Structures are given as C-alpha cells and as structure tokens.
A protein has these predicted regions:
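Iron-sulfur-associated redox domains of electron-transfer enzymes in respiratory
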Residues: 1-144
Length: 144
C-alpha cells in the first residue's frame, strides 16, 4: 500500500490586467504550472486586503502569492506601489504570528510574461513543498 503525499494548497491572487493575463498566456502556450495553485482574479493587486491572506491561511492554504503589474505599469497608476507598502507590513505580521515568511510572496508579472508566471508558480510550489504543511493552521482556523 502506498502512502499518498499531500500536495500543498497555494492561493494566487492575480491582477486582472497583467498577472492573470500572464497566467492565461501560460495556458495558451501550454506551459505547465502546478495544479495545486488556485488562482483568484482581482481587479488590481492593491485590492488584496491583508485579511484575505490571513483568511486563506485560516481556510487551509499552505502558501499565498500575490501577483501584480510591474511598478510603473499599473492600470490604476499607483496600485502596485500601494501593494508593496501594504505587504511589507503584512509579511512582518505573519512572522509575528509564527508563519514562515517564505509561505507568502509578492511578484510582478506582466501580461506578456507567461513563461515567467509558470516559472514563478513552479518555484513557489517547490518552496512550499519543501516547507511542508503549515503547522500554524490549527491555531489559525476558525472554531465554529
């Protein structure tokens, strides 16, 4: 009898204008990225509230990645600058909560970078797999 290895659950918040289009391009070019990556399309990376990341961890995510437009290329002018400042604070808060900083990542991927999107997801999935299951999940889960 074989023991099945649990694959990590990864939530990817992707900007509609760049990163989601990059994911679409990766798919159209038949570039593989891990099936355990679940993509959530958002209008802009600045619309990802830090509570969304915490909620993803509460609901069982082993890793969360936020993907947006390159700085200076935001469809909403300065959304990604706001994202960068906001998530610098979130990353330090996650460490305070006992969640390894490697479990969360912020990446810039343009609509023309399908290969970069696939490579980024592959790299992040390997990082999360090496970390193993999120041990803090039981403490973070909502008790109902």
């Amino acid at each position: 009898m074989q023991i099945s290895e649990k694959k990590p659950l990864i939530v990817a918040f992707c900007c509609n204008w760049c990163s989601y289009a990059g994911a679409d391009l990766a798919g159209n070019n038949r570039l593989n990225y891990p099936a355990e990556v679940k993509i959530i399309r958002v209008p802009c990376s600045c619309r990802v509230n830090p509570t969304f990341v915490l909620r993803a961890f509460q609901r069982g995510a082993d890793g969360v990645i936020i993907c947006g437009c390159h700085p200076g290329d935001c469809h909403y002018t300065s959304g990604n600058y706001y994202t960068r400042r906001r998530f610098a604070l979130l990353f330090s808060m996650l460490e305070f909560l006992g969640i390894e900083k490697e479990r969360t990542r912020l990446e810039w991927v343009s609509a023309a970078e399908g290969a970069k999107f696939a490579a980024t997801m592959e790299d992040f999935a390997k990082t999360i797999a090496a970390l193993g299951e999120n041990k803090r999940l039981e403490d973070l889960r909502c008790k109902r």
